[in-house]
Amino acid sequence: MIHLKNGRTIWAEHVRENGAHLEYDIGDDSYAIPRSSVERVEAGGVPPAYSPASGTAQPTRDLPVFTPGGSLKLEDDLADRIVHDGHVDPDALTATERKGKPELTATAYFIAGKHEFEQGDLNQCRRYYEAALRFQPDNATVLTYYAALLLRTANAEAAVSYADRAVRSDPESPDAQAILGYAQFYTNRTREAIRSWKKSVHLRPDAAIERLIAKAERELAAEAEFSQRESSHFTLRFEGKQTSEALRRDLLTALESDYDDLVRSLGSTPRSNILVVLYSDQAYFDVTRAPAWSGAVNDGKLRIPINGLSSVTPDLARILKHELTHSFISQISGGRCPYWLNEGIAQLLEPSTVDGRGHRLAQLFHTQREIPINTLEGNFIRFSAAEATLAYDESLAAVQYISETYGTSDLQRILERIGQGSSAEAALRSTIHSSYGDLEAEVARFLVGKYGD
């Protein structure tokens, strides 16, 4: 645990001194900070309960990530042959397939797929899972993992079909029931999702899924009297007494315009209609349990508080585009985008800049009192309102620097590399040739040059 002089803390797996710098490791990535900015280093302790974005847990935007825990009976015998030295052996896969034993071959491809899933190479993972299903199309475990992959890559409609097949193949699988619940929730089948999740926790208690059931039940209660309208890319749910027809029409028009703009900016489109739910302020906080400083939530559904609004105000327009941008980013990055990059891009495309706060940020970076960017990979929900404001500003500053220096196209390439399995820092290195440490130094110079110190 590294205690910084600015009062912040970094949780690291390994720490070492290197001259004037302190180097530390988090996962596969290494970082360096000036020794002069460190107050002390302590061994032990338990990290705070949030996950880095490389693990894709983003509670205020997406449902908690669920990874199945099942295995196949031949896995233990094959695992070391299929994966060794950290890589899948394609020759071993070919040799296994030549034996002409469907169960053995399916297991080999399944092992390879799980390895690539853990490494973040979701495209290769998909190919291996599909190969496994060619040899065992009704294997509930493979179907469950494949459905989980489809959810991770924002293809919930297809995930419903595969998860349903998994449940029909093995109704007593808690993993299959859980994944089916996720897929149903993401495709606006909330009642069905609750039933599936309840079956899952009956088979195997799970506190996280119990919380999802409670959230879904709050949603159903809040939206019991809601009506619905659809446009080309959106499904709008609303309470008639809370919104006028003119506001609903203007909202859909604004969202469709934002959708087209984001397709041009980011070069990708979500695979299915996006659900937008309009709440009174109280219902919004009742359903989402979001912190008081949040203006909206995108947890796979855009949840927007609109108390007292009769038109699409400039503030509401920015919120709509910000939250919609998260849906596009999730699609491109396979749900793996770190929080700082996700929030930075969403702010940039509102559009917003740090112009009004640039001088203050320049001073913070100049005196090394900023929040280290690598610690902003995880969810901002753990921050106080003041810390969250700084985290959002730093995120926007970093993304604004990348955009103004290298262009928006490099932001898109960073997202694509993350979606292909790269860590955030590896994606930065392969596009703008910067580590996190380099990026912080470059952002500091950018802010001082643009806004003064």
Annotate each language-model stretch with its function.
Residues 225-338, 349-358, 367-370, 374-381, ...:
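Juxtacatalytic substrate-recognition/specificity segment
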Residues 103, 137, 171, 204-205:
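Short coil turns that delineate tetratricopeptide repeat
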Residues 108, 142, 176, 209-210:
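TPR alpha-solenoid repeat register
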Residues 1-135, 185, 194:
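Compositionally biased alpha-helical segments
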Residues 374-453:
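Pan-zinc metallopeptidase signature
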